[in-house]
Amino acid sequence: MLKCDICGKGPLAGYQYSHSHRKSIRKWKPNIKKVRAIVDDTPVRLHVCTKCLKAGKVQRAL
């Protein structure tokens, strides 16, 4: 599964409870986008979560 190249956010695992409280394992996946960003004055493809994109932690390439 993908991780954010900026903050390192990745999938989390936990339990999903039914109405009768039986447990089944499920995953929460981060919203990760493939973005062309500028790193050291060169455009590079990065996997970035939308929280980092909204916060402006990535300078996007045109």
Curated annotation (Swiss-Prot):
Transmembrane segments: none annotated. Keywords: Ribonucleoprotein, Ribosomal protein. One of its GO terms (cellular component) is ribosome. GO terms for molecular function: structural constituent of ribosome. The keyword Cell inner membrane does not apply. It comes from the Bacteria. One of its GO terms (biological process) is translation. It holds the Pfam family Ribosomal_L28. SUPFAM superfamilies: L28p-like. The keyword Plastid does not apply. Belongs to the bacterial ribosomal protein bL28 family. This is Large ribosomal subunit protein bL28. It comes from Thermoanaerobacter pseudethanolicus (strain ATCC 33223 / 39E) (Clostridium thermohydrosulfuricum).
